[in-house]
Amino acid sequence: MYVPMKAVNAKEGTITFDDEDGTEMTLPLTGGNVKLQWKPDFGARWAALDVDFEMYGKDHSTNTPIYDSICRILGSRPPEHFTYELFLDQDGHKISKSSGNGLTIDEWLTYASAESLSYFMYLKPKTAKRMYFDVIPKAVDEYHQQLRAYETQDDKGKLNNPVWHIHGGDVPKSDMVVPFSMLLNLASVSSAEDKSQLWGFIQRYAPDATPEGNPGMDAAAEHAVRYYNDFVKPAKVFRAPSELEREALEDLRDQLKTWDGGLDAEALQTMVFAVGKERFDPLRDWFTALYEVLLGASQGPRFGGFIALYGVDETVALIDDALAGKLTTA
């Protein structure tokens, strides 16, 4: 209710006004009896609670001088301010409840950890960021990269690392032996419906890893299966290889058939690189072909690492299926 004040008794801490039906009312200001308009509420709250730091979105920035003035009038010093930019949708539009174009916290947590969300929100607060489902895998992998980097940093580096602030200085170790983006690719080629399918690949690549000993990895495997089925699977589009791509894929397959280098991801990557370098300029066209023909995606992981995780024999079979046209009709 917005009504004019008939009387203000500063000594007694009361106000007098006419109610909606014309009845004169006198109420104490305390005890939750009254509420300020939102603009003066900022400055009054700062003064009453001795606030020394306030973060808020840029939509409040134009009113900051008003908030500060009210705080000073009430005899207090305004706090230090930090204004952050707003989140945008994938098309660069402002997120709003009415348009339903937002990504909610619950939706993020369906596919990734709370820490990955904290990491995403921490980065570049003064830059407007697009927040939609496709940014989740990158945020997860970058968060774990920072966890691993933290272990080798000096004190200054640790203080500048986002994970120090996310965890309040008590930073855990990453137990992700496989990147989240790689888990998504594994889920894709194996059509995984359950995280146990992914653990078969994970434990071949990292035999000491277990769901019990690597709870973060286990949660990520479950998130990856869920994310794959909800977002990747409906959008997968395989294409047939060109003649040049077919020749390169046959060469890669034949070299893999005689491969005796174990599951060394770097050695496998070197071989994949060499096959492409003989035929493609620019070389990225080769890797794009691998992703589009074998994974049904426009981008993907370091392919040597993928082979090491998925398996050499399995990759040979995958290439054979692609060359036979089985993937484009799947």
Predicted segments, located by residue:
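An acidic intrinsically disordered interaction segment
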Residues: 26-32, 147-157, 250-264
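Generic amphipathic alpha-helical segments used as scaffolds and interaction surfaces in large
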Residues: 54-58, 99, 170-174, 189, ...
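Aromatic-anchored, charged helix-turn/loop surface patch used as a conserved interaction hotspot
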Residues: 210-263
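Glycine- and acidic
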Residues: 46-55, 88, 99-103, 253-256, ...
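Active-site cores that bind ATP or allylic diphosphates and position pyrophosphate for catalysis
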Residues: 1-83, 88-99, 105
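Catalytic adenosine-cofactor/nucleotide-binding cores of aminoacyl-tRNA synthetases and other
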Residues: 59, 64, 84-226, 295-329
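C-terminal accessory/binding modules appended to enzymatic or scaffolding proteins
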Residues: 240-295
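Short polybasic/polar patches that bind polyanions
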Residues: 72, 110, 277
